[in-house]
Amino acid sequence: NDLHFKVMMISNTTLDNFHKDYLANPKPWKKYGLKHITDFYTIFKIGFRIRDEAHEHLHFNFKFDLFTHVGKTLDLSATLIYDDQGTERISKIIYPVNDRFDQGKWDTYIEVMSVEYSLKPTTKGLKWTQGFNGPYNHNQFELSILKNRVLTEAYLGIIRAIVQELFIDVRADNEKSLVYCSTKEMCSKVSAYLQDRFSHITVNRYIGEDEYDNLLTAELVVTTPKSAGTGVDVPNLGVIINTVNISSTQANVQLAGRLRYNEKIASRYYYLTCVNIPHHLKYDAEKRHKLRNIVKSIGTLDTAHRL
């Protein structure tokens, strides 16, 4: 049959559904000419497959390759790096090091700062671990704040002051900012609070249930690492304020990487660190080590803010 297109765009989810359906019941597909699962590429005359965000879903990507039969493939990723040694080993099997294009030194243009704040001696009710003495959980941290009216007001005040100082007061023409929170509840609370305090600009929330235009049209967007941490480009984005404490190298590089080089706007990535929470200090040290060769500079902004 004649094909009236040169490029096909298809999601991983759609392909995964096709693979599962074909493997479970291949007979209906054979009437369309798919005698084998790889015939998909022959029927649509696909000779070159490009896959973005190749660092995600390694198991699916490996299975994807087994079912792919084309002349050329190209996988794209800025963060084919893993903290877990087992995952790192598997990634080198799927994407052999000798087959990777080494572009050399990173284009280092992002200025990174750890924004430090502290807890008041009287602060009570904060939780930040999964269970008793478990791993750090930032969702738990945010939810414990939201359960306490005094803590909520104090935390919102800290975020407002940081946004004021690091974005509003020094904002370039048409410059935009992202504020990362971890939970839907905190995103809703912070976005409403900042819109009330900064009525001269548009503040939007952007999470999974929101319109994509929310991300692109506002001067200030409150979002989550899952919603806008990878695969999105915000025009004129100059400032990221990350309130979420994350250890993952891949996640930290991806979040900072939302800042694209712009000769008219400096790229600044700020992450919050509470000096009284051991996990925050540990993650701060890890981020400095992991980002040291990827960004322009890493510094510390010691504030008087207290929660």
Task: For each feature predicted by the language model, list its residue ranges.
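Post-DEXD/H (motif II) to motif III coupling segment of the RecA-like Helicase ATP-binding lobe
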Residues: 44-114, 299
